Amino acid sequence: MNGVMNFKPIYEPRPDDGLRVMLYSHDSVGLGHLRRNLAIAGSITQSFSEASAMIVTGSPCATQFELPASTDLIKIPSISKDSDGQYVTGSFGGSLETTLRFRSRMILETYRAFSPDLIIVDHQPTGLKGEAMATLKEAKANGTKIFFGMRDVVDSPDVVRRDWDNADCHWALNECYDQICVY
């Protein structure tokens, strides 16, 4: 072995318009997920001259950041946490369930309209309370490559086990994702 590793690309850009990447994160608290997705989008569009990126985020601050070249942004309704740590709807109003259904539809319709070669999901394997499941299932059925990205430390092991110990999360981690990236 000569020390050089050869990796086979797991995606092939379309010859007509280059690589298209959709980056999703629920972004209910803080700026870390959005900033990470902005950095990833910038790196992709700089590395591939014909690439384009679409960021889908619930961050209330999303429109205050400069977007990298060839990158656009879909702002879904914000969800935050109350003083008890429970998710609540933002200015969209209505119930949390109604807001999550609306966000889920926006994520799915963005996927359909943008038609990405690759989806990168940040932090929550199925999105906030499963809001990305319909998109993940359709993307998987269509042969879209799907990556999951996460920080090296998410929360305490007990909290992660509690949050991720369900059938949808197991499906996403074991069958849906083509790659899992730890940042």
Locations of regions flagged by a protein language model:
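Conserved nucleotide-sugar donor-binding subdomain of glycosyltransferases
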Residues: T89-L128
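A short, glycine/small-residue-rich beta-strand->loop->alpha-helix junction that serves as a flexible
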Residues: S25-L38, C61-A62
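Active-site-proximal region of nucleotide-activated glycan assembly enzymes
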Residues: T135-Y183
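Conserved nucleotide-sugar phosphate-binding/catalytic loop shared by glycosyltransferases and other
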Residues: D17-L19, S25, S43, S47-T98, ...
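Nucleotide-activated donor-dependent transferases that construct or modify glycoconjugates
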Residues: I10-G30
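An aromatic- and histidine-rich active-site surface loop
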Residues: C61-T63, I120-E138
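Structural motif
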Residues: R20, D117-L118, Q179
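Histidine-anchored nucleotide/phosphate-binding helix
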Residues: L34-T45, M133-A139
